[in-house]
């Protein structure tokens, strides 16, 4: 999926509002994913998955940092996320289907925290961005 110039502008503008909360939003998105898709918990058997756990917060920070990196490299998402794609495909062996459900949790989290900025156009751009990130993260499975 190709991000248009308008999509890139929308994504960057929305992400600038996230600011230093990327880790918190990442943790919240993980919690939403675990609640909505309980099978995703199987990849975290060693985690305390309760609300507000230190492990979920720490992993949420990794998610937020990865998305911040991606926002900074919208013209080269495969290059920017190559190592993360390798990690998930070859070491962690996460089922690629799980990457299809994670964008919804991220979109919900952003909509809750950025209600005034979450216009239909921004929603569509963020959806394309998160779906593209998911596609890139599963690209090494092929």
Swiss-Prot record:
Provide the Gene Ontology terms for cellular component: blood microparticle; haptoglobin-hemoglobin complex; hemoglobin complex
Summed up, the tissue specificity of this protein is:
Red blood cells.
Q: What is this protein called?
A: Hemoglobin subunit alpha-1
Q: Gene3D superfamilies in the record, alphabetically?
A: Globins
Q: Which organism is it from?
A: Equus grevyi (Grevy's zebra)
Q: Where are the transmembrane segments?
A: none
CDD domains found in the cross-reference section: Hb-alpha-like
Keyword Iron on this protein? yes
Q: Report the protein's function.
A: Involved in oxygen transport from the lung to the various peripheral tissues.
- Mind telling me which Pfam families this protein's record contains? Globin
Q: Which BP terms from GO are recorded?
A: hydrogen peroxide catabolic process
Family note: Belongs to the globin family.
**Could you cite one Gene Ontology molecular function of this protein?**
heme binding
**Complex formation:** Heterotetramer of two alpha chains and two beta chains.
Sorted alphabetically, which keywords does the UniProt record give? Heme, Iron, Metal-binding, Oxygen transport, Transport
